[in-house]
């Protein structure tokens, strides 16, 4: 299956925003096993605004145009990277991250410590932990690993 990545301006495209939120939810439900259903519902209330406000948003679509995943970058920070769970392991995360690094200078990411698969993905790509926070950005008790791309690693210039 072929995929394409495109930078997008979300604007007032509510149907695309709904697709991205659905991708976020499916991904989080499959990977963030440390969150309760109530946690997911609470966080879901913030997701549309977070997606709409990110400086650079890139979407990965399948041959039929359906959203397969997306990445958001603000300054050098990867703010979000979500892949539809049915397509995990196909290399889409690396494709989106390659795009974010080469096109938007992404070198930083914050990862939930309890999401071991994501931590492993970023480490394999070439990120390393440089700091840790006991709580997430909303003050909830979900520890965050602050990671940066090693200068000589995959994807870096």
Predicted regions and their residues:
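Conserved beta-hairpin
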Residues: 55-69
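Conserved GNAT acetyl-CoA-binding A-motif
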Residues: 102-114
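Conserved N-terminal entry element of GNAT/NAT acetyltransferase domains
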Residues: 1-15, 153-157
């Amino acid at each position: 299956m072929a995929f394409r990545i495109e930078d997008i301006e979300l604007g007032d495209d509510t149907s695309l925003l709904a697709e991205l939120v659905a991708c976020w939810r499916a991904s989080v439900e499959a990977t963030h096993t440390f969150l309760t259903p109530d946690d997911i519902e609470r966080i879901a209330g913030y997701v549309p605004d977070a997606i709409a406000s990110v400086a650079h948003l890139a979407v990965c679509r399948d041959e039929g145009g359906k959203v397969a995943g997306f990445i958001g970058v603000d300054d050098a920070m990867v703010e979000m990277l979500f892949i539809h769970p049915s397509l995990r392991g196909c290399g889409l995360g690396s494709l989106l991250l390659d795009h974010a690094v080469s096109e938007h200078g992404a070198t930083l990411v914050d990862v939930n410590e309890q999401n071991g698969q994501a931590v492993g993905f970023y480490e394999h790509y070439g990120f390393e932990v440089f700091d840790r926070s006991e709580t997430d950005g909303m003050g909830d008790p979900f520890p965050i690993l602050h990671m940066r791309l090693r200068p000589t690693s995959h994807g870096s210039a």
